[in-house]
Every structure is written in structure tokens, then in C-alpha cells.
């Protein structure tokens, strides 16, 4: 089986995890991931075909981090001071960003010297969702000399995940849509008083 067909086989298996060998792998791995740290650096990607499509290369300067994010709505703490229940502002609040984007931000805070390139889903159970985040060292000589990735060394890419410049961030900002119906997502949601989404 050549490399192209192997990647295609893996891609099809991950599309329907429960119907393929992936389901058995996740049953084995998820309990271990649940017990481990919430942000953990790993040696190599779990989904090599997905990681490579998103820009990962097996060379120095690339780092893969697995992040665990709790499922469900936002956990807002209850205000200590008194007020009527209507003004508590505790329930039914949404963070306005996906779990994947939150996972990318957590990886960035853990490794502030790296930059987030992209991320992908690797599993979920009743409590958590798990994502793998591809990170790049913009100061590494091999990254600086690689014309395919050295754009991430520019100053304008610093802290890109916090400004919604990754794939998950752009999706949450509504930037996948163009033309009719997307008049209020550009130049930004804030410029249109959050009416774009």
C-alpha cells in the first residue's frame, strides 16, 4: 500500500470512528488521556494524515500538543455580592468561540514561545473533547529557512491564535462565508456591533 492510499484509508476511518478501527483505539486511549494533564506535549501526531494536511512536517521546530477541554456551557462563577437573581449573570452565557479555539488558546498559554499553526479533533467522551494542536517555533533556524512555513516568523503572526487567525478562529468569526449574507462579518464582528453571526 503506497503512502497516498494509506493516508486516504486513515482519513476515511477517522470520518466514522465508531464504524472503524479508530473506535477500538479510542476506547483504549481515552481513559489514559482523561487521567493525564490537560495540556500535554506528545512525540508525534495521532492522526498523521490530518496533521500533514494542516501543515505539520516531521522536522525540528514543529511541536504537537494534545489539549483536553471540558464539554458543556461556560462555567461562570456566582457573584459574591448580593443582587436579584435576574442580574446574577451566571447561566446561559456562551463564550462565543468553539471548544477547538479554546484548546488552541490553552496550548498557546502553556507554550508562549511557540505559535499555533492549526489543530484537529482526536476524540471525545462524556466529559471532555480532545484536540491536537500543531505549534511552530518561529525562532528555529530550520523554520526560518523553510519557504513553506517561514511566514509564521513575521511579527504580524505573534499571538495569532488570540486574534482569531487560525482555522478554528476564522470559522468562529464567520469568515468562511462570503458575499450575500456575510455583510457584517468584515472587517470584524466588533465593527458591526456583533451582528454578523
Swiss-Prot record:
Q: Which Gene3D superfamilies match?
A: Ribosomal protein l15e (3.40.1120.10)
Q: Tell me which UniProt keywords the record has, alphabetically.
A: Ribonucleoprotein, Ribosomal protein
Coiled coil stretches, renumbered:
none
Molecular-function annotations in GO: RNA binding; structural constituent of ribosome
The answer on whether this UniProt entry bears the keyword Ribosomal protein reads yes
UniProt-listed InterPro entries: Rbsml_eL15_core_dom_sf (IPR024794), Ribosomal_eL15 (IPR000439), Ribosomal_eL15_arc (IPR020926), Ribosomal_eL15_CS (IPR020925), Ribosomal_uL23/eL15/eS24_sf (IPR012678)
- Whether Ligase counts among this entry's keywords is no
What is one cellular component GO term in this UniProt entry? cytosolic large ribosomal subunit
Tell me a GO biological process for this protein. Answer: cytoplasmic translation
Locate the region Disordered.
Answer: 70-99, 163-197
PROSITE patterns cross-referenced by the UniProt entry: RIBOSOMAL_L15E
The entry sums up its family as follows: Belongs to the eukaryotic ribosomal protein eL15 family.
Protein's name according to its UniProt entry: Large ribosomal subunit protein eL15
**What organism does the UniProt record list as the source?**
Methanopyrus kandleri (strain AV19 / DSM 6324 / JCM 9639 / NBRC 100938)
Amino acid at each position: 500500500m503506497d503512502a497516498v492510499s494509506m493516508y486516504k484509508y486513515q482519513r476515511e476511518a477517522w470520518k466514522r470512528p465508531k464504524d472503524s478501527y479508530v473506535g477500538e483505539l479510542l476506547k483504549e486511549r481515552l481513559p489514559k488521556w482523561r487521567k493525564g494533564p490537560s495540556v500535554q506535549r506528545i512525540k508525534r501526531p495521532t492522526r498523521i494524515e490530518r496533521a500533514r494536511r494542516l501543515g505539520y512536517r516531521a522536522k525540528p521546530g514543529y511541536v504537537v500538543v494534545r489539549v483536553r477541554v471540558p464539554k458543556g456551557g461556560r462555567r461562570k462563577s456566582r457573584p459574591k455580592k448580593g443582587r436579584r437573581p435576574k442580574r446574577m449573570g451566571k447561566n446561559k452565557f456562551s463564550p462565543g468561540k468553539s471548544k477547538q479555539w479554546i484548546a488552541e488558546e490553552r496550548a498557546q498559554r502553556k507554550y508562549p514561545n511557540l505559535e499555533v499553526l492549526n489543530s484537529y479533533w482526536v476524540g471525545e467522551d462524556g466529559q471532555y473533547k480532545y484536540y491536537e494542536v500543531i505549534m511552530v517555533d518561529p525562532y528555529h533556524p530550520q523554520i526560518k529557512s523553510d519557504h513553506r512555513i517561514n511566514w509564521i516568523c513575521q511579527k504580524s503572526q505573534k499571538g495569532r491564535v488570540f486574534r482569531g487567525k487560525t482555522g478554528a478562529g476564522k470559522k468562529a468569526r464567520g469568515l468562511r462565508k462570503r458575499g450575500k449574507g456575510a455583510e457584517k462579518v468584515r472587517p470584524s464582528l466588533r465593527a458591526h456591533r456583533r451582528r454578523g453571526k
